[in-house]
């Protein structure tokens, strides 16, 4: 009986793909070796312990319909589009060894005519006339009896967009999370013009089979039919939730300041698990009462643009004469925290 399992996703939904990965990892027999191949449409994927407001330009992501997905492994933030091929290798312990999966990916690249080397703990690099360039980054997760290694291969990713979404706005954001390192990267199409996702998947699959000396048929995972994976619906609901993707952020503080025609405003937030635990306001407005009331109302509020807007607009009942100021304030706060 084979110990290998090969899964290929035909979904571009990052929450779907990460939920599939999580379910397979939790439920696989300890004797199984798994290869899961997938890719995501426009998404910023952050590490388990990262702060999205620090790592990402969340406002631009929202404007461009780019999703945020928090993975279960550590490490930094990356931008995925359909120019990335994603891979996940899973195995039980003691057999799990990320050097084996790294070797398989390097063998796959070699079969395509690309000589790459492992660099540091997480990267694969190729030599170019301009120096070493990263073509793959990885992250890892281990539990008591199993582990996985997942990563991306840059085929034809839009590298300019990568810079757009991973460069946060210059805000006064003092955070305790991990800051991603911006790396020099290159697409494999520079070395192999015309290379496709399907060709790369085939090369990785063949290297996987060759290493273990076995072959299996691929299982295609599709959102058109709910995957036959125990607890998939619950896992997908969690993976796609605001509470997981944003609310798991480490504690951080945020200072917003702006000058309006009616006065200057400074708002100080302390945020834990996506909830405002403390809000302070400073202003030289001649009528500070609405702002003082807002600071009280914001404590316990989710750190989300729509929730902050609701808190501002709720004050219109008590301060109707300040409607113009409150609507200006509401629009500014919502824009500043996106």
UniProtKB/Swiss-Prot annotation:
<dbReference type="InterPro" id="IPR004562">
    <property type="entry name" value="LipoylTrfase_LipoateP_Ligase"/>
</dbReference>
<dbReference type="InterPro" id="IPR023741">
    <property type="entry name" value="Lipoate_ligase_A"/>
</dbReference>
<dbReference type="InterPro" id="IPR045864">
    <property type="entry name" value="aa-tRNA-synth_II/BPL/LPL"/>
</dbReference>
<dbReference type="GO" id="GO:0005524">
    <property type="term" value="F:ATP binding"/>
</dbReference>
<dbReference type="InterPro" id="IPR004143">
    <property type="entry name" value="BPL_LPL_catalytic"/>
</dbReference>
<dbReference type="GO" id="GO:0017118">
    <property type="term" value="F:lipoyltransferase activity"/>
</dbReference>
<protein>
    <recommendedName>
        <fullName>Lipoate-protein ligase A</fullName>
        <ecNumber>6.3.1.20</ecNumber>
    </recommendedName>
</protein>
<feature type="binding site">
    <location>
        <position position="134"/>
    </location>
    <ligand>
        <name>ATP</name>
    </ligand>
</feature>
<dbReference type="Pfam" id="PF21948">
    <property type="entry name" value="LplA-B_cat"/>
</dbReference>
<comment type="subunit">
    <text>Monomer.</text>
</comment>
<feature type="domain" description="BPL/LPL catalytic">
    <location>
        <begin position="29"/>
        <end position="216"/>
    </location>
</feature>
<dbReference type="GO" id="GO:0036211">
    <property type="term" value="P:protein modification process"/>
</dbReference>
<comment type="similarity">
    <text>Belongs to the LplA family.</text>
</comment>
<keyword id="KW-0436">Ligase</keyword>
<feature type="binding site">
    <location>
        <position position="134"/>
    </location>
    <ligand>
        <name>(R)-lipoate</name>
    </ligand>
</feature>
<dbReference type="InterPro" id="IPR019491">
    <property type="entry name" value="Lipoate_protein_ligase_C"/>
</dbReference>
<feature type="binding site">
    <location>
        <begin position="76"/>
        <end position="79"/>
    </location>
    <ligand>
        <name>ATP</name>
    </ligand>
</feature>
<dbReference type="GO" id="GO:0005829">
    <property type="term" value="C:cytosol"/>
</dbReference>
<dbReference type="Pfam" id="PF10437">
    <property type="entry name" value="Lip_prot_lig_C"/>
</dbReference>
<comment type="function">
    <text>Catalyzes both the ATP-dependent activation of exogenously supplied lipoate to lipoyl-AMP and the transfer of the activated lipoyl onto the lipoyl domains of lipoate-dependent enzymes.</text>
</comment>
<comment type="pathway">
    <text>Protein modification; protein lipoylation via exogenous pathway; protein N(6)-(lipoyl)lysine from lipoate: step 1/2.</text>
</comment>
<dbReference type="GO" id="GO:0016979">
    <property type="term" value="F:lipoate-protein ligase activity"/>
</dbReference>
<keyword id="KW-0963">Cytoplasm</keyword>
<comment type="pathway">
    <text>Protein modification; protein lipoylation via exogenous pathway; protein N(6)-(lipoyl)lysine from lipoate: step 2/2.</text>
</comment>
<keyword id="KW-0547">Nucleotide-binding</keyword>
<keyword id="KW-0067">ATP-binding</keyword>
<feature type="binding site">
    <location>
        <position position="71"/>
    </location>
    <ligand>
        <name>ATP</name>
    </ligand>
</feature>
């Amino acid at each position: 009986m084979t110990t290998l399992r090969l899964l290929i996703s035909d979904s571009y939904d990052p929450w779907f793909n990460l939920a599939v990965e999580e379910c397979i990892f939790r439920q696989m027999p300890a004797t199984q070796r798994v290869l899961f191949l997938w890719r995501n449409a426009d998404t910023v994927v952050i590490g388990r312990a990262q702060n999205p407001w620090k790592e990402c330009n969340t406002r631009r992501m929202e404007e461009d319909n780019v999703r945020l997905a928090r993975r279960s492994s550590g490490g930094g933030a990356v931008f995925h589009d359909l120019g990335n091929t994603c891979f996940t290798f899973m195995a039980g312990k003691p057999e799990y060894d990320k050097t084996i999966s790294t070797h398989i990916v390097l063998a796959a690249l070699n079969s395509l005519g690309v000589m790459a080397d492992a660099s540091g703990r997480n990267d694969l690099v190729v030599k170019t006339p301009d120096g070493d360039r990263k073509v793959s980054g990885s992250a890892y997760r281990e539990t008591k009896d199993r582990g996985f290694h997942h990563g991306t291969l840059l085929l034809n990713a839009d590298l300019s967009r990568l810079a757009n979404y991973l460069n946060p706005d210059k805000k006064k954001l003092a955070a305790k999370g991990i800051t991603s390192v911006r790396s020099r990267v290159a697409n494999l199409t520079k070395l192999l013009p015309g290379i496709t996702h399907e060709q790369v998947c085939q090369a990785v699959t063949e290297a996987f089979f060759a290493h273990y000396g076995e072959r299996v048929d691929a299982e295609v995972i599709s959102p058109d039919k709910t995957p036959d994976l125990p607890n998939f619906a619950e896992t997908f609901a969690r993976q796609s939730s605001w509470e997981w993707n944003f609310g798991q952020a480490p504690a951080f503080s945020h200072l917003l300041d702006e000058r309006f025609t009616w006065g200057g405003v400074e708002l100080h937030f302390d945020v834990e698990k996506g909830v405002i635990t403390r809000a302070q306001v400073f202003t030289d407005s001649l009528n500070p009462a609405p702002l003082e009331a807002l600071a009280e109302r914001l404590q316990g509020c989710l750190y989300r643009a729509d929730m902050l807007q609701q808190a501002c607009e709720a004050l219109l009942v008590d301060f109707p004469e300040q409607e113009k100021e409150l609507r200006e304030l509401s629009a500014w706060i919502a824009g500043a925290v996106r």
